[in-house]
Amino acid sequence: MGSDKRVSRTERSGRYGSIIDRDDRDERESRSRRRDSDYKRSSDDRRGDRYDDYRDYDSPERERERRNSDRSEDGYHSDGDYGEHDYRHDISDERESKTIMLRGLPITITESDIREMMESFEGPQPADVRLMKRKTGVSRGFAFVEFYHLQDATSWMEANQKKLVIQGKHIAMHYSNPRPKFEDWLCNKCCLNNFRKRLKCFRCGADKFDSEQEVPPGTTESVQSVDYYCDTIILRNIAPHTVVDSIMTALSPYASLAVNNIRLIKDKQTQQNRGFAFVQLSSAMDASQLLQILQSLHPPLKIDGKTIGVDFAKSARKDLVLPDGNRVSAFSVASTAIAAAQWSSTQSQSGEGGSVDYSYLQPGQDGYAQYAQYSQDYQQFYQQQAGGLESDASSASGTAVTTTSAAVVSQSPQLYNQTSNPPSSPTEEAQPSTSTSTQAPAASPTGVVPGTKYAVPDTSTYQYDESSGYYYDPTTGLYYDPNSQYYYNSLTQQYLYWDGEKETYMLAAESNSHQQTGLPPAKEGKEKKEKPKSKTAQQIAKDMERWAKSLNKQKENFKNSFQPVNSLREEERRESAAADAGFALFEKKGALAERQQLIPELVRNGDEDNPLKRGLVAAYSGDSDNEEELVERLESEEEKLADWKKMACLLCRRQFPNKDALVRHQQLSDLHKQNMDIYRRSRLSEQELEALELREREMKYRDRAAERREKYGIPEPPEPKRKKQFDAGTVNYEQPTKDGIDHSNIGNKMLQAMGWREGSGLGRKCQGITAPIEAQVRLKGAGLGAKGSAYGLSGADSYKDAVRKAMFARFTEME
């Protein structure tokens, strides 16, 4: 037993070899499998978090800005992917770049910590710091630091010897080199730049193979390799309360700028800065020079204590690529949409009779100074866009661009003046119709030719275009307006509508001309009264103008609402008291009658002095008797009743110290409301006055019960109803002892069984009672044994017998 030694597991062996080798081999294989799975999972996490984490910054302004812009340098893409940076670096293949990658960062570090650490070093300062995060907000352990110039990045790396110490941890630094951009492909249908691994377009679902065949080789590579230059630069990391004057003061040593050259982006709700602004210069060369100056500043530019990042402003959308490989600016789609509507409306107005012409406001007229600056800015902006569009499109296809200067200039916010011109000849009247008919076949580049049959449009496939506000149809290339249900052709600048019977797209102008010329002259009067069911291009333009006015009014009301309440009330009391005293001295008793006589003279004089009779909305067509146009016409005329230079209300004949007091007077004063009501009624015709009274009657509550009482009188109240009395029915219940107890009861039978006989007493010797015990009623409140506490009353006695016995007992007690 002692010699038998048990073989240990480490010493076992067999014909299959040592178990040690087998266990080691299995362990190595399982360890390699786990390592492969972990590597695959980490790569999947990087690929899945690529889009969400790259935008997850501490600054929401920078997040919105990067989401709305295309970064050509770092390879951001509009479909949700970007050319990822090479995270697994090879030192031998590392190339110098402006972006430096910091690896091995602590999990608790933030972007602000990295930025503070970078600012503490002497030398060039970074332009941007981006910390990579997961969807949960936890840091992924690496970040990107971007410099303005390549020299700054290389000098900073050499000064720190590619190593940093952050929070007691050694951080490795590497140059970040993005993946090659020529691997990405451009969709030929919707012109979207897709990530290289996508086999179908992210937006329209087109195959990658078709786009690679149709697009000429080298087009995307040559386009993407060119840097983006424009006349506008963007300023990032602006403080929430920075104003335009501060930006102008900071940029004044480097460029001469005006207020209209700077656009500070603010939040619509909070009215605070969103963190960036745009500076537009006269040319792209000036913008490039200013950008180089600002990027070369040491220390960098600071406004209100915050370091400002400077770069070229990129477009929010990719440029459109024509089938032959040339590019056209996508901004022209949004810019020509409203211009085409206003241009077609002016063409249709000149083609109908030719007696009305709409020109710009002349110097000296009311409203000229207010709109002169805006008109100049808009004209300059859209002329630059139109010039770029014409040069690109003409070099691309060799055809003339249909965008005219009149259509571009009409985009500016203008007031039009109505003048009379001699009537044109019939040939001139026919020119607009012939031009539209000849332009219809020219819509072939978008795939839509009016008159040919097409499939029924599928609105579920449309994509929303933020720049124009329309929905883009990738199959036909048209832009769809859901409000008016019209399609817009961006090349021919025409509005179309879908005809279900003919299964084709029809021109909106043709439908309007058919309605006007197809009916006999006898029915023209009825046709003017009937409202057209379908909207034409001029009605769409009116809707756009009305919408713009409503937005401006909402902004003004929103600004005026933010005023201290106490100061408003005190100023209102002082002004109202002084105004009432002055009004009582001058007006006396005949104020109302004199005012009614004065208002028509005031309006007549205003019409003679101001040739601007009607606004832009009423000038589009002669049929302006509907309610919306009537309200707009009255509002435009009411604006003339206030003199904003003298701060006086011409209607009430009162002067105020400032603009706020005048605005409060117009909005809150009962006197102004009363005078305005009289003024409006005096300006209305009989038909309009009847329509207004009818609408007021409909808005008021109609007491039909009072009308019935006045007509038929008050009826007499009805007689009160008598309550019905029901007699309680007699209930027959069992009374077994009413006639006495007989010998048939159970107790009697039990006693007889024990030897008892009727008439004898109870007990062994028959010494007990012989009659049954009778029930007696005791008086309430009487104690046991008290005199008169009980009187003889059986349970079978009626109420009458019980009362008689009680009276007899009481009588005997009294004796």
Curated annotation (Swiss-Prot):
PROSITE patterns: G_PATCH (PS50174), RRM (PS50102), ZF_RANBP2_1 (PS01358), ZF_RANBP2_2 (PS50199), ZINC_FINGER_C2H2_2 (PS50157). One of its GO terms (biological process) is spliceosomal complex assembly. Residues 1-93, 411-467, 510-539 are annotated as: Disordered. Disulfide bonds: none annotated. It is found in: Nucleus. Keywords: Apoptosis, Metal-binding, mRNA processing, mRNA splicing, Nucleus, Phosphoprotein, Repeat, RNA-binding, Spliceosome, Zinc, Zinc-finger. Residues 426-446 have a biased composition (Low complexity). The keyword Secreted does not apply. The modification Phosphoserine is found at residues 18, 59, 69, 72, 78, 444, 621, 624. A zinc finger (RanBP2-type) spans 181-210. A zinc finger (C2H2-type) spans 647-672. It holds the Pfam family Zn_ribbon_RanBP. It comes from the Eukaryota. Residues 321-809 are annotated as: Required for interaction with U2AF2. Residues 98-178, 231-315 form the RRM domain. InterPro entries: G_patch_dom, Nucleotide-bd_a/b_plait_sf, OCRE, RBD_domain_sf, RBM5_RRM1, RBM5_RRM2, RRM_dom, Znf_C2H2_type. Belongs to the RBM5/RBM10 family. Component of the spliceosome A complex. Binds to ssRNA containing the consensus sequence 5'-AGGUAA-3'. Regulates alternative splicing of a number of mRNAs. May modulate splice site pairing after recruitment of the U1 and U2 snRNPs to the 5' and 3' splice sites of the intron. May both positively and negatively regulate apoptosis by regulating the alternative splicing of several genes involved in this process, including FAS and CASP2/caspase-2. In the case of FAS, promotes production of a soluble form of FAS that inhibits apoptosis. Component of the spliceosome A complex (also known as the prespliceosome). Appears to dissociate from the spliceosome upon formation of the spliceosome B complex (also known as the precatalytic spliceosome), in which the heterotrimeric U4/U6.U5 snRNPs are bound. Interacts with U2AF2; this interaction is direct. Also interacts with ACIN1, PRPF8, SFRS3, SNRPB, SNRPN, SNRNP70 and SNRNP200; these interactions may be indirect. This is RNA-binding protein 5. It comes from Bos taurus. The gene is RBM5.
